[in-house]
């Protein structure tokens, strides 16, 4: 807590003209993130996710310990690093959230509406699904992103995601690539990674899910992308969104080889 307050104080004291203060601002923001990462609040949500994974729940009163996240029933370590991927039992490509919802339905007996009712966290109201994603993601910490593209439907989703990334749409004629398709782009004090290149994609994708300080809770990658689409004034995506999963697939494929540091921490 003391470190967080010190970091906020440092951030608040930035002065000078925008041009002269720019580099100093980014240095202070980097220090701020370092201080916060030392006691990432996401760790508490991660612990809750593990408990939810192991606790019998739902109409069938069973746990999720036999849920297959792509590496076999109950195998969690390294699974997040290889998602999204194609699942034969569902006949489609799924990311971690879509797969957990599937397991909650098929194994625990929850309805789709019940499993997705609170799919994202709000300040003071944590989502069970987000907690599960946070824990699953943490089990791939230190592993390289390695999304499979062997199945035709996986390759199809990568192409679809690439199309969505570069498509300009909506009343503002806006798209992902406007902000994230070139080097040196910034919004206010926020440097924007070039996600069309491997280096930028690795840097961005390796720290999700992440605790967002400005929101006071953990955001998943699907939540982040859905919100990006909202900000671009695109049609609202219904969770879990195949379009968003395709975009995730494209970005994770671009980020191949990046080492996960999950859960991360963001502004």
Which role fits each region the language model picked out?
Residues 44-45, 156:
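An amphipathic alpha-helix/helix-turn recognition signal
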Residues 15-21:
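Sec/Tat signal peptide C-region and signal peptidase I cleavage site
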Residues 143-160:
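Solvent-exposed, charged amphipathic helical/linker segments at domain boundaries
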Residues 162-166:
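Short secondary-structure capping micro-motifs at structural edges
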Residues 3-15:
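Bacterial N-terminal signal peptides
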């Amino acid at each position: 807590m003391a470190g967080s307050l010190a970091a906020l104080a440092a951030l608040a004291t930035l002065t000078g003209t925008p041009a002269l203060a720019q580099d100093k601002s980014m240095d202070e923001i980097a220090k701020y993130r370092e201080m916060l990462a030392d006691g990432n609040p996401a760790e508490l949500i991660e612990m809750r996710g593990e408990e939810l994974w192991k606790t019998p729940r739902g109409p069938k009163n069973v746990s999720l310990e036999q849920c297959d996240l792509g590496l076999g029933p109950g195998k969690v370590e390294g699974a997040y690093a290889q998602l999204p991927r194609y699942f034969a039992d569902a006949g489609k490509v799924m990311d971690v959230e879509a797969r957990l919802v599937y397991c909650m339905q098929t194994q625990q007996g929850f309805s789709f509406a019940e499993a997705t009712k609170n799919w994202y966290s709000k300040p003071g109201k944590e989502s069970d699904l987000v907690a599960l994603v946070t824990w699953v993601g943490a089990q791939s910490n230190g592993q390289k992103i390695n999304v499979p593209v062997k199945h035709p439907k996986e390759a199809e989703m990568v192409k679809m995601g690439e199309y969505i990334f570069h498509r300009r749409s909506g009343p503002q004629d806006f798209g992902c690539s406007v902000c994230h398709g070139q080097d040196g782009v910034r919004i206010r004090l926020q440097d924007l990674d070039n996600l069309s290149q491997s280096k930028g994609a690795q840097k961005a994708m390796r720290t999700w899910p992440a605790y967002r300080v400005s929101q006071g809770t953990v955001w998943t990658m699907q939540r982040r992308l859905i919100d990006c689409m909202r900000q671009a004034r695109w049609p609202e995506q219904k969770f879990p969104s195949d379009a968003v999963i395709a975009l995730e697939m494209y970005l994770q494929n671009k980020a191949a080889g990046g080492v996960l540091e999950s859960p991360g921490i963001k502004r």
